[in-house]
């Protein structure tokens, strides 16, 4: 039996919702699983991945087998990975969710969605990417004492997204190391008040709130110095008509949000604008990904 899992890319934090908010977008990693006589892991698109038991898809699948007291059989795993790695688009969460869903289906769907989310969060360490990867939409999550509390809302389909992906990686560890150990009380209030507006802005048609809802003082000011050209990308995206611009996850991708009615004009302007920025401030090139929100989440066939 061959099992195929598709998992969407995710964009965490959404500006103000540091380590709490995330949303899924229409870019998908796919993984197929088949039982075999030996472990065989390959990449269908040439992406360099570990081909042994250190592979995150395999480790996640094994984690589920271990949790239910079963021995994982030898597997043939084939990955297709269009989600760029170490760019703030949830590539590791996609691997974790793929491994868990593949293993869960092999075992007859022994874990429910909440149990899968909890196990995924224990592997990843935080729920802001794994929740939207599994559930789709915009998720608000808390991880407390090993329990995940998560709420999913469908994102307004009149919005479109532009993931502006630079040609350099930013590892999450480095991005987290840049954060201060303490923050000012007023900065916490600044973010809390804006994060409270995010669901209305993204899910209830309040596009007038998109810009203010995604403003941040907790992480972006500290991470953007590690992202050459990001300040200019923010400015360019706004000039081209973006309603909101924020650092996706830990970076290095910048996510811009626009109204779908203006999508073609927005994307065309942005593409030309990014060409003007290439070679500036240590970034040689940008890839522009035209995306929508994914309200379905991961799927298994």
Language-model features: where?
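ATP-binding N-lobe of GHMP and related small-molecule kinases
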Residues: 1-87, 101, 109-111, 293-296, ...
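FAD-binding core of FAD-dependent oxidoreductases
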Residues: 11-13, 17-24, 86-96, 124-139
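Solvent-exposed alpha-helices and their adjacent loops that cap or buttress functional pockets
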Residues: 13, 22-25, 69-71, 123-124, ...
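DPxDG-like acidic metal-binding loop motif
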Residues: 27, 89-113, 134-136, 144
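Short beta-strand-to-loop capping motifs
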Residues: 35, 166, 256-260
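Alpha/beta catalytic cores of group-transfer enzymes, especially the acyltransferase/condensing modules
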Residues: 113-159, 245
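Active-site rim beta-loop-alpha module in soluble metabolic enzymes
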Residues: 163-225
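Glycine-rich, charge-dense phosphate/pyrophosphate-binding loop(s)
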Residues: 202-301
């Amino acid at each position: 039996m061959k099992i195929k899992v598709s998992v969407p890319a995710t964009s965490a934090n959404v500006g103000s919702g540091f380590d709490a908010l995330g949303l899924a977008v229409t870019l998908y990693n796919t993984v197929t699983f088949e039982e075999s006589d030996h472990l065989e892991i390959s990449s269908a698109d040439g992406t360099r991945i570990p081909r042994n038991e250190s592979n995150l898809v395999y480790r996640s699948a094994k984690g589920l087998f271990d949790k239910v007291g079963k021995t994982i059989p030898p597997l043939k795993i084939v990955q297709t990975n269009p989600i760029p790695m170490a760019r703030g688009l949830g590539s590791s969460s996609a691997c974790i969710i793929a491994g868990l869903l593949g293993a869960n289906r092999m075992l007859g769907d022994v874990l429910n969605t909440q149990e899968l989310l909890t196990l995924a969060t224990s592997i990843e360490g935080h729920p802001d990417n794994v929740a939207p990867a599994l559930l789709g939409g915009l998720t608000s999550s808390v991880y407390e004492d090993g329990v995940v509390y998560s709420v999913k809302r469908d994102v307004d389909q009149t919005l479109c997204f532009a993931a502006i992906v630079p040609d350099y990686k930013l590892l999450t560890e480095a991005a987290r190391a840049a954060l201060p150990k303490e923050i000012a009380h007023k900065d916490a209030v600044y973010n809390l008040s804006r994060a409270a507006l995010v669901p209305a802005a993204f899910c209830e048609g309040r596009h007038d709130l998109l810009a203010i809802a995604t403003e941040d003082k907790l992480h972006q000011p500290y991470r953007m110095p590690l992202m050459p050209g990001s300040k200019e990308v923010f400015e360019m995206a706004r000039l081209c008509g973006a309603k909101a611009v924020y650092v996706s996850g830990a970076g290095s991708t910048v996510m811009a949000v626009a109204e779908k009615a203006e999508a073609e004009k927005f994307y065309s302007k942005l593409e030309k604008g990014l060409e003007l920025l290439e070679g500036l401030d240590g970034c040689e090139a940008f890839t522009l990904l035209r995306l929508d929100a994914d309200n379905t989440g991961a799927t298994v066939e």
